[in-house]
From Swiss-Prot:
Stored InterPro entries: Aldolase_II/adducin_N, Aldolase_II/adducin_N_sf, MethylthioRu-1-P_deHdtase_MtnB
NCBIfam families from the UniProt entry: PRK09220.1, salvage_mtnB
Protein's GO biological process: L-methionine salvage from methylthioadenosine; monosaccharide metabolic process
Cofactor notes: Binds 1 zinc ion per subunit.
GO molecular function: methylthioribulose 1-phosphate dehydratase activity; zinc ion binding
Protein name: Methylthioribulose-1-phosphate dehydratase
Reported cofactor(s): Zn(2+)
Known catalytic reactions: 5-(methylsulfanyl)-D-ribulose 1-phosphate = 5-methylsulfanyl-2,3-dioxopentyl phosphate + H2O
Length: 225
């Protein structure tokens, strides 16, 4: 390091490690078709004041280490003058609020986007009775319900973040939808965030398929033996 170079306020080694974790997982989600047209954004807590996050406008299926940047929890770029996602605040608000949260994933699969449009007027999607509800941290039985909030889309992230915070004041949750947009899911690790994301995707797809069936024929409950 020369005399004119200020030390980085975060661990470069840790950033290198997290960049590869992010890239590997994001590539899988991109190949699944959940990040079309450079959409979606992903982050991982770097330390108590910083997060590693995808640079805006990059093809998520072809990310390299330079496509992962650092922001502080005020959403300011740190280390390199790159542009983070316009939705960075929706990541950092979770890191600020929950010290245990280490990963936030935002995707735009067709299932997520269609469900967000279909249920926009209801403000929530109620998932109930599914065995896979146990995929969400804290759930130990299928005999429960998980409500997925559906927020109105807006380009004003301050407004949306305030709405998310207001709901978090009232209930615990592991994700939410934005109308006509996509899904946010998070967890205490990349593995847990992926599990929550995949569980939401599967359960939302089940709900959409049930709606199709109910639209064409009556669904008769199967009696328990």
């Amino acid at each position: 390091m020369n005399a004119t170079t200020a030390p980085l306020p975060y661990s470069a080694a840790r950033l290198h490690e997290l960049a590869h974790v992010l890239i590997a997982n994001i590539r899988e989600l991109a190949h699944a078709g959940w990040t079309p047209a450079t959409s979606s954004n992903f982050s991982h807590r770097l330390d108590e004041q910083h997060a590693a996050i995808t640079v805006s406008g990059r093809d998520k299926g072809r990310l390299v280490e330079e496509d992962i940047m650092v922001v502080d929890f005020d959403c300011l770029a740190v280390g390199r003058p790159l542009r983070p996602s316009a939705e960075t605040l929706l990541h950092t608000q979770l890191y600020r609020r929950f010290p245990e949260i280490c990963c936030v994933l935002h995707t735009h699969s067709p299932v997520q986007t269609i469900a967000s449009r279909l249920y926009a007027g209801s403000d929530v999607i109620r998932l109930e009775g599914y065995e896979l509800l146990k995929a969400f941290e804290g759930n130990t039985t299928h005999e429960t319900a998980v409500e997925v909030p559906v927020f109105a889309n807006t380009q004003d992230m301050q407004v949306l973040a305030a709405q998310v915070d207001a709901l978090l004041d009232k209930q615990s949750m592991w994700g939410y939808l934005i109308e006509g947009h996509g899904l946010y899911a998070w967890g205490r690790s990349m593995a847990e965030a992926r599990r929550h994301l995949e569980a939401f995707e599967f359960l939302l797809q089940c709900e959409l398929e049930l709606l199709k069936l109910r639209g064409t024929r009556q669904v008769v409950p199967v009696p328990h033996s």
